[in-house]
From Swiss-Prot:
The keyword Nucleus does not apply. GO terms for biological process: ERAD pathway; glycoprotein catabolic process; SCF-dependent proteasomal ubiquitin-dependent protein catabolic process. Signal peptide: none annotated. Keywords: Ubl conjugation pathway. This is F-box only protein 27. PANTHER family: F-BOX ONLY PROTEIN 27, F-BOX ONLY PROTEIN 6-LIKE PROTEIN. Part of a SCF (SKP1-cullin-F-box) protein ligase complex. Interacts with SKP1 and CUL1. It comes from the Eukaryota. It holds the Pfam family FBA. GO terms for cellular component: cytoplasm; SCF ubiquitin ligase complex. It comes from Macaca fascicularis. Residues 100-277 form the FBA domain.
């Protein structure tokens, strides 16, 4: 018998596709400033301040200018957006050289405090009790914190304070005295699971001579020992701000209740002061 002959179809080799030319990246910096302004107005405020402002001098000038933020607010139909736009139009900031428009801070709800989570002890006036202040990792996640680190106290009262100059932060007297802003203060504090702790907070609104015009204090009950790494939040809103407020003094204390050498006291972090429009 003869061998079976197989008839296979010849495999088709696909023809090579023509090489496509690489697409050119879109360079937004080539846009006219008026058109680039419209494009940037669709970017979230925090991204504008944190990233876009760093791209180049041209972008920085647009982000620091008032026109971009007025364009953003004109499209914001929320109660906060409408109130902020009305405030911006009726209480315009004076011309400033090389100063970012403060509307960006309002839109992004950016705090005006410095070093809230323990990047060393910089920007704080400190008094060291016991073995003094140190910085450690958080034992419990603090929502919204820029970093998960905290300031830790010792077996005697440790004190830490910042005095914030509102005009240096870009706010001007007419705005501060308009009766249409409020100041929200916030602080997180907690304990180790194996040691109780105590905590105090004092926030004062000061005039140009640093005379106290208003204040808020919190002296919560101590956290007991064996507490599952408790973490608590303290907030207060100054909504009826008196004429003449120019500074905010933010001060807190902490210590442990076991009086152990080392750092077993109150753990404080994510301290913030936010100036925002008052919704009447």
């Amino acid at each position: 018998m003869g061998a079976w002959a197989s008839r296979g179809r010849a495999a088709r080799v696909p023809a090579p596709e023509p090489e496509s030319e690489p697409e050119e990246a879109l360079d937004l910096s080539q846009l006219p400033p008026e058109l680039l302004l419209v494009v940037l107005s669709h970017v979230p405020p925090r991204t504008l301040l944190g990233r876009c402002r760093q791209v180049c001098r041209g972008w920085r000038a647009l982000v620091d200018g008032q026109a971009l933020w007025l364009l953003i607010l004109a499209r914001d139909h929320s109660a906060t957006g409408r109130a902020l736009l009305h405030l911006a139009r009726s209480c315009q900031s004076p011309a400033r050289n090389a100063r970012p428009c403060p509307l960006g801070r309002f839109c992004a709800r950016r705090p005006i405090g410095r070093n809230p989570c323990g990047q060393g002890l910089r920007k704080w006036m400190v008094q060291h009790g016991g073995d003094g202040w140190v910085v450690e990792e958080n034992r419990t996640t603090v929502p919204g914190a820029p970093s998960q680190t905290c300031f830790v106290t010792s077996f005697s009262w440790c004190r830490k304070k910042q005095v914030l100059d509102l005009e240096e932060e870009g706010l001007w007297p007419e705005l501060l005295d308009s009766g249409r802003i409020e100041i929200c203060v916030s602080d997180w504090w907690g304990a180790r699971h194996d040691s109780g702790c105590m905590y105090r907070l004092l926030v004062q609104l000061l005039d140009a001579n640093q005379t106290v015009l208003d204040k808020f204090s919190a002296v919560p009950d101590p956290i007991p020992q064996w507490n599952n790494n408790a973490c608590l939040h303290v907030t207060h809103v100054f909504s009826n701000i008196k004429m003449g407020v120019r500074f905010v003094s933010f001060e807190h204390w902490g210590q442990d209740t076991q009086f152990w050498a080392g750092h077993y006291g109150a753990r404080v972090t994510n301290s913030s002061v936010i100036v925002r429009v008052h919704l009447s």
